[in-house]
Amino acid sequence: MRTLTIRTQRPYNALIAPGLLDRAGQEIARVLSPCRAVLVTDDTVDALYGDKVLESLHRAGFDAAKFTFPHGEESKNMQTYQQLLDFLCACDLTRKDILIALGGGVTGDLCGFAAATYLRGVRYAQLPTTLLAMLNSSVAGKTAVDLPGRKNACGAFWQPSLVLCDTAALDTLPEREISNGLAECIKHAVIADAEMLPLTRLPVADYVELAARNVAVKERFVSQDERDTTQRQFLNFGHTAGHAIEALSGYQLRHGECVAIGMVLAARIAQGLGICAPDVPAAIIQSLNAARLPIRC
């Protein structure tokens, strides 16, 4: 198992290993004493892991309930957020209690935003089940929901208390979702750690090291600039055009696919302005092609 400390104002650990969901309750109880807990997940992930994680929480002494919502970016809105808040009130959750996000980036963003705002802030844990969430959003501290026509327009910075990355969960993902996550890996390689690129060609079963290297890159930027005002903005590489493409596609294109296209556009613009080496766009395209990611709309 790999353990990385995320050095923010409230430091926490990210644990990376196969099988963590089986003992999620035990690992969470090491950091957050058993209390009332609400597990937040979408209907797809719930069918795979919801009951298993809920039972693990019960075994560890948590008084746990589960909130499930329809999967997809379309659910990351104020309506679902309000439904979650209503559920927390119905459970009589207090500031001594916790939320747990089980799923991909949508779940992490929604649960994290609820944790940041309910009773002016409660603790929460991230249990990412997609490669994209493991490499990116689960350790970012950025939480948000979408507003009409605006992605992540209503949100807050709120760090989790623990992140559990169970790499065995990646075995259930279709190839497209693996490629979706590799886009963020390629982004991290371009901006900070080119030596990790060969890791993107490893079998999914060997992704513990890949996840650890990416979390380390993310931690480096977040620890220097938790509020995203200076250095952390390097992590937005590919996202300026990427978010626009994602919205214009009606979210039919995955986030990583849109970031991939955005990176190509940004690199070509930089090449045209003479602020990057001439071979950079071609190198990025080669890596994206190897990861089966789009390079144009």
Regions found by a protein language model. Give the residues of each.
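Glycine-rich beta-strand-to-loop/alpha-helix junction loops that act as flexible
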Residues: 71-72, 102-104, 237-238
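Non-catalytic interfacial helical region
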Residues: 85-99, 111-126
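Solvent-exposed alpha-helices and their adjacent loops that cap or buttress functional pockets
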Residues: 31-32, 92-94, 117-119, 146-147, ...
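ATP/NTP phosphate-donor binding region
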Residues: 1-98
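Active-site segments that bind and position negatively charged phosphate/pyrophosphate groups
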Residues: 198-297
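A glycine/threonine-rich phosphate-anchoring loop and its flanking beta-alpha core
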Residues: 15, 113-202
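Short glycine/serine/threonine-rich phosphate/pyrophosphate-binding segments
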Residues: 106-113, 134-135, 244
